[in-house]
Regions:
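Conserved ABC ATPase "signature" C-loop
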Residues: 261-262
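Conserved ABC transporter NBD signature motif
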Residues: 108-116, 125
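The feature captures the beta-strand-to-loop junction immediately N-terminal to the Walker
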Residues: 85-87
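Conserved ABC ATPase "signature" region
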Residues: 161-179
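Helix-to-loop junction immediately C-terminal to a conserved catalytic motif
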Residues: 100
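H-loop/switch region of ABC-family ATPase nucleotide-binding domains
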Residues: 243-244
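ABC ATPase nucleotide-binding domains
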Residues: 2, 6, 10, 14-17, ...
């Protein structure tokens, strides 16, 4: 990798830190700069490891000998937050269960930082790959929230003091601070879901797998999960989520993978993937609602999120008002900070 590319990667990593919510920024900076941390050079090295030697190679899997579920699957893994979407039966859950070691491939390999992990047990992968079940009741078994969150880190050999720090951080990140002594089954479903997420966050794994994290979550819960994804990404972790919520996918994931019948139909950014009409039709998926709206209104540009749409359209309104109030020419308009986008003039 050239020095220029290294600088670009570093700039992108630090931009994530800068854009993080205030209450998480200091923790992320400490993680990147503080004593005992990897530092920026170490983070870059970890990123290069992800890019070069993590993924699935020629993977085959079936539950029954004559009914293949995944066939000749090849996929590279990197640090980008990744959403896996597709209809039920597409092979999404089977794929992430293979990554966690719940099931073993019939053939092929799974590599993690250059090491073949396809033969490792769930216990052996506990410290590196975290998994949050769709139903938190399949995961929770302790009598209070703190004991539940501490169970994982203590059982993978984490120092007790460090485990308490990680647990406190996980509870703060999930909005559960102050509920440490509550019985998880006295909490609402969305809070139990956050408890399950916190219990895996505290283990500080390199990979976090989330199975339908937005189910039973209101707007606030969705915002918290989005913050968790950004925070982990800023710490150099990989978040993989199985989702049916296309709007949440568009808002929070840099990489989107569409699966159908055990095959990958599309793999790219959200904008790239949701622009593939035939692939979406084949996978029986819909575009995010905002994208559908912008296309129905005839906009030349497709918008993925409400924020993107409002920012652009408000800039358009400002430009139109400015032009109506004066006899400004197009050239002078450009000089005042506007640029032309299609047939519209948008403020920078």
């Amino acid at each position: 990798m050239s020095m220029r590319m290294r600088k670009q990667v570093c700039k992108k990593q630090w931009e994530r830190v800068r854009q993080a919510p205030d209450r998480y920024r200091q923790r992320m900076l400490k993680q990147a700069q503080g004593p005992g941390s990897l530092g920026l050079a170490g983070r870059l090295k970890t990123l290069l490891l992800w890019m070069s030697s993590s993924g699935l190679k020629k993977l085959d899997f079936s539950y029954l000998a004559d009914i293949p579920v995944l066939e000749d699957l090849n996929m590279k893994l990197d640090q980008r937050p990744t959403a896996i979407i597709g209809q039920n039966g597409a092979g999404k859950t089977t794929l992430v269960k293979l990554l966690k070691g719940f099931v073993k491939p019939v053939s092929g390999s799974i590599y993690f930082h250059g090491e073949d992990i396809s033969g490792k047990t769930v216990a052996m992968l506990a410290g590196s790959v975290g998994y949050v079940f769709q139903n938190p009741d399949d995961q929770i078994f302790k009598y209070n929230v703190m004991d539940e969150v501490l169970f994982g880190p203590l059982n993978i050999g984490m120092d007790p003091e460090q485990a308490k720090k990680e647990a406190a951080w996980a509870l703060e990140l999930t909005g559960l601070s102050g509920k440490e002594k509550e019985n998880p089954y006295d909490l609402e479903l969305y809070e139990r879901k956050m408890t399950a997420i916190a219990s895996v966050l505290a283990m500080d794994t390199d990979v976090l797998i989330l199975d339908e994290p937005t189910i039973a979550q209101d707007w606030k819960g969705r915002q918290i999960i989005g913050s968790i994804i950004r925070s982990l990404s800023g710490r150099g972790k990989l978040v993989i989520a199985i989702l049916h919520d296309m709007d949440f996918v568009a808002e929070n994931f840099e990489r989107v993978i569409i699966m159908a019948h055990g095959q990958v139909l599309a793999d790219g950014t959200a904008k790239e993937v949701f622009a593939q009409e035939e692939v979406l039709k084949k996978a029986r998926l819909q575009k995010p609602y905002v994208m559908q709206l912008s296309e129905a209104l005839g906009y030349e540009k497709s918008y993925l999120t409400v924020e993107e749409l409002l920012k652009d359209r408000m800039s358009l309104c400002a430009a139109i008002k400015l032009l109506k109030k004066s006899s400004i020419t197009k050239n002078s308009c450009l000089k005042q900070g506007f640029f032309v986008f299609g047939h519209r003039k948008i403020s920078e």
